[in-house]
A protein has these predicted regions:
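Flexible, solvent-exposed loop/hinge segments and secondary-structure transition points
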Residues: 2-193
Length: 193
């Protein structure tokens, strides 16, 4: 019986030390990971906005927390500025594609048009669902209107409020469409203030 207790105590001590070391490593790496994610988002918004904006600042933490509480798919919000003028907002949001969770960045301009779209992370099928990461797909978002509070999907988007749907990857492109429409009310809230 004593051997069982001794073995149990040894395992408990080893587990406690391992957990402590993991916590220490996590405390060092969490800031590095957060900074890398921030830089990846800013890079996406620099591509999305081009010369329409030159600064991307995180939205005030209290405002962001309120939005994230209300809109669960929102991960981050950026204020897009040209000089000191706010020209729009960038919203990172999640959705569920064919391969699982995806993270997208959408740039929304204060004139009611889309500055652009980029996929930040996905697990979609290579060559099919991953088309959402390619210029022929995301270039079609630029200038599309969301003035009516939503955008629509179409395989051949011609109307000002239609974004592309991909044949053979409808789940992926539907996830993008649903994600954008789900965060438009959040944009309305932050842009009205």
């Amino acid at each position: 019986m004593k051997n069982y207790l001794k073995t149990g105590l040894v395992l408990l001590v080893i587990s406690a030390v391992a957990a402590g070391l993991l916590a220490v490593v996590n405390s060092f790496t969490s800031e590095v990971i957060a900074q890398a994610e921030f830089e990846k988002s800013v890079q996406a918004y620099q591509e999305i906005y081009g010369d329409k904006a030159d600064k991307f600042e995180p939205l005030d933490e209290a405002k962001k927390a309120a939005l994230v509480e209300k809109y669960k798919e929102i991960q981050d919000v950026f204020v897009a500025k040209k000089g000191d003028e706010i020209v729009g907002y960038g919203i990172n949001h999640t959705g569920n594609g064919y391969g699982g969770s995806m993270t997208n960045a959408i740039g929304l301009l204060n004139d009611g048009t889309i500055a652009g779209f980029r996929n930040i992370q996905n697990a979609e099928t290579p060559g099919i669902g991953t088309q959402i990461t390619e210029a022929p797909y995301f270039d079609q978002f630029v200038g599309k209107s969301f003035k009516n509070g939503e955008v629509k999907g179409n395989k051949d988007p011609q109307a000002e409020d239609e974004i592309p749907m991909i044949s053979g990857a409808t789940i992926s492109s539907t996830a993008v469409l649903k994600g954008i429409n789900s965060i438009l009310p959040a944009y309305e809230e932050i842009s009205a203030k």
